[in-house]
Design a protein with these regions (language model features):
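Active-site catalytic pocket residues across diverse enzymes, especially alpha/beta-hydrolases
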Residues: 24, 155, 240
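Short amphipathic alpha-helical segments
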Residues: 100-101, 151-153, 238
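Short phosphate-engaging motifs
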Residues: 27, 124, 146-147, 229-232
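N-terminal accessory regions of nucleic-acid-interacting proteins
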Residues: 1-82
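Conserved RNase H-like, two-metal-ion catalytic cores of nucleic-acid enzymes
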Residues: 67-137
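Acidic active-site catalytic centers that drive phospho-/nucleotidyl reactions
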Residues: 90-92, 147, 166, 229
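Conserved DEDDh/DEDDy metal-dependent 3′-5′ exonuclease domain
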Residues: 105-108, 112-190
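Acidic, Mg2+-coordinating catalytic module of metal-dependent nucleases/exonucleases
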Residues: 188-250
C-alpha cells in the first residue's frame, strides 16, 4: 500500500490522491513515468519525482525511518511492506504518570514469538534495546498517546526511530469504538474467561497483589493479560488493514 501512497507529498491530500488513482496513476512508478499531470506544474512534478525517488530508495533499502513523514493516522500504509519486520508492543505500568510511575511489564511479539520482561525479574533494557533494533515498524494500540511517550520518558533512546503504527487510529476511522478488548469482541475474538474482563486498572491491581504477597499466581495472570494484548493485536491489525484497503480500492 505504501507504494500506492502520495499523501506524504507536500500539498497532496486524500482527495487528490484518490484523483491520481482514478486516473490510472496507481503507484510511484506510474506517477514518475507520466510526462505531465493535470493541475501540477512542471517544476512541482520534478520535485515530486525526486521525492518519490527518495521514498523508493528508502523503502527498498528498508529504511523505514524515512516514513516518519507520515502522520500517525496513515502509518497503516506501511504494514503490508514491513509486517515481517514489525513488532507488536505493549507495556504495563504502576500508573499513568510517565514522570513518576514505572514500567512493570514490557511485552513484544514478532508475529510468531512473544517475549516478556518483568520489573525486578528479567527486565534488561540493554538487551531490550538490542532486540528492538531488529524491527522496522512498531505496532501498538493507543501507543502514540501512552506507551511510546511513557517509554521515551522512562527509558530514553530505548525505542528505535521508526514509525509507530497505532492501530487505534485505524479502528476509529473504520467505526470501531472502545479499547482493544472491545474491538476484539466486535470482531469475534474471545479471551479466556479468567482474563476476559481485565482492563488496565486490573493489570495494576495484579501487580500490587503480586508485590504484596509474592504469589506468582497474580504475576502469571498479569503476564498472560499482557501477552494476549500483543498477540491479539496482530489478529486485529490484519483484519483492519484488509478492511481499509477494501474500502479504498472498492
Amino acid at each position: 500500500m505504501i507504494q500506492n501512497s502520495f499523501i506524504f507529498l507536500e500539498g497532496i491530500g486524500a482527495k487528490r490522491e484518490k484523483e491520481f488513482w482514478s486516473n490510472g496513476i496507481s503507484d510511484w512508478d506510474r506517477f514518475i513515468d507520466c510526462e505531465k499531470i493535470n493541475k501540477i506544474s512542471k517544476g512541482r512534478k520534478l520535485f515530486y519525482n525526486r521525492r518519490l525517488g527518495e521514498a523508493k530508495k528508502a523503502l527498498f533499502g528498508f529504511d523505514s525511518s524515512f516514513f516518519n513523514i507520515l502522520s500517525h493516522s496513515q502509518n497503516w500504509r506501511l504494514y503490508d511492506f514491513f509486517k515481517e519486520d514489525a513488532v507488536f508492543l505493549d507495556i504495563e505500568t504502576t500508573g499513568l504518570d510517565r514522570f513518576h510511575d514505572d514500567i512493570t511489564v514490557f511485552g513484544i511479539y514478532d508475529g510468531l514469538n512473544s517475549k516478556t520482561m518483568i520489573k525486578g525479574i528479567n527486565m534488561d533494557y540493554d538487551l531490550l534495546k538490542k532486540e528492538l533494533q531488529k524491527y522496522k515498524l512498531i505496532i501498538t494500540f493507543n501507543g502514540s498517546s501512552f506507551d511510546v511517550p511513557f517509554i521515551n520518558k522512562r527509558c530514553p533512546d530505548l525505542l528505535p526511530k521508526i514509525p509507530n503504527f497505532d492501530v487505534k487510529f485505524l479502528a476509529r476511522y473504520l467505526g470501531y469504538q472502545g479499547g482493544l478488548k472491545k474491538i476484539e469482541r466486535d470482531l469475534g475474538y474471545q479471551r479466556p474467561e479468567i482474563v476476559n474482563e481485565f482492563n488496565g486498572g486490573d493489570a495494576l491491581s495484579l501487580w500490587k497483589m503480586y508485590k504484596a504477597t509474592g504469589d506468582e499466581y497474580y504475576l502469571n495472570l498479569l503476564v498472560e493479560y499482557n501477552e494476549l494484548d500483543i498477540v491479539n493485536l496482530k489478529k486485529i491489525t490484519d483484519i483492519l488493514v484488509s478492511k481499509i484497503k477494501g474500502q479504498i480500492f472498492s
